[in-house]
Amino acid sequence: VVEKFAALSQAASVVASPQLRNRGTIGGNLCQRPRCWYFRGDYACTRKGGDTCYALGGENQYHCIFGGGACVIVHPSDTAPALIALDAKVRIVGPKGARVIPLEQFYVLPEKDATRETVLEPGEMVLGVIVPAPPAGQRSGYRKVRARGSWDFAMAGLAHAVTMKAGKVASARLVLSGVAPTPWRLPAVEKL
């Protein structure tokens, strides 16, 4: 994992605290709920089906700068951006059977449905993650900026998977963390 999937290794190494990393799962990290104090508090906010995002006019220094709209939560996972940069898929199982989808399609923006973070249906759960073998010449990584040295969410982070051929960038996947309701891919930058 360290050699072939450095982005995942680096992201997993900065999740929460050592105690939580040793007990948690990738599925749990992918599916964790947002950390917005209005959502976590007693407010009937947009995320809970109300008609107001209290963070828009209140305490919002840790909320999104991209893709918010009706709800400005940020997605808290460190591993999701890394896995999306690595073009991973997620295996989902539930009462209606199993399915596999690209992890990039797993998350739901508030503009589509402000009450959901993922496409999981009732009774479904993440069974596993499928990460394809990296192409020759690919290098990946993850860097996270946070207020404290450990056990803190990303204020911003970047996962990258860049493939080089003949000394030139053949392809790049760049995904931000801590700045949007979902891991935020940068397709315009990838094309440069």
Go through the PLM ranges and name each one.
Residues 1-192:
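C-terminal structural segment of proteins
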